[in-house]
């Protein structure tokens, strides 16, 4: 809603309604499983990792995103758009997410596909790992300071398990 208010305050409510309607109708066609991610998540949990999702999406939209992506049903949405008044690159969503799942910032890593994810991780004082698939612009992800960049799921696995 903030973006709509900023760019078209007189139409913000209508634009948000249309945006949510579009997501509800098209999300299953727009989101697909990234091969290897469900297994990587399972392996991380088996290794003792405490996992959670911090997203700029509304909680309901984030839940709807999981179904076509074949992500585990019990993967916690630790922080969603409505949970904080500010959003990435501000660190508040990541800090809230870590608190929600009981994660230790000293050993936490945030994986994201956009420059704002890596900026928020840095501002939260944790390592950020960029992936070049997803919604972000790979060149921007590569240009942002980070703890690693993964162009494939195997590269991400290597970074996270080292």
Language-model features: locations:
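Asp-based, Mg2+/Mn2+-dependent phosphohydrolase catalytic module
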Residues: 42-45, 49, 58-59, 63-162
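N-terminal helical cap/lid subdomain that shapes the substrate entry/recognition surface
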Residues: 1-47, 60-63
């Amino acid at each position: 809603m903030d973006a709509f208010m900023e760019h078209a305050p007189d139409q913000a409510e209508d634009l948000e309604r249309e945006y949510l309607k579009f997501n509800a109708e098209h999300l299953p066609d727009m989101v697909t499983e990234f091969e290897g991610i469900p297994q990587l998540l399972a392996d991380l949990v088996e290794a003792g990792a405490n996992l959670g999702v911090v997203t700029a999406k509304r909680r309901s939209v984030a839940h709807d995103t999981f179904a076509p992506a074949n992500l585990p049903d019990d993967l916690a949405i630790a922080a969603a758009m409505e949970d904080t008044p500010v959003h990435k690159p501000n660190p508040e969503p990541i800090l809230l997410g870590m608190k929600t799942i009981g994660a230790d910032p000293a050993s936490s890593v945030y994986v994201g596909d956009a420059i704002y994810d890596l900026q928020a991780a840095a501002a939260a004082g944790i390592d950020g790992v960029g992936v070049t698939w997803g919604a972000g612009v790979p060149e921007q992800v590569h240009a942002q300071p980070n703890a690693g960049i993964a162009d494939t799921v195997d590269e991400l696995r290597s970074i996270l398990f080292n």
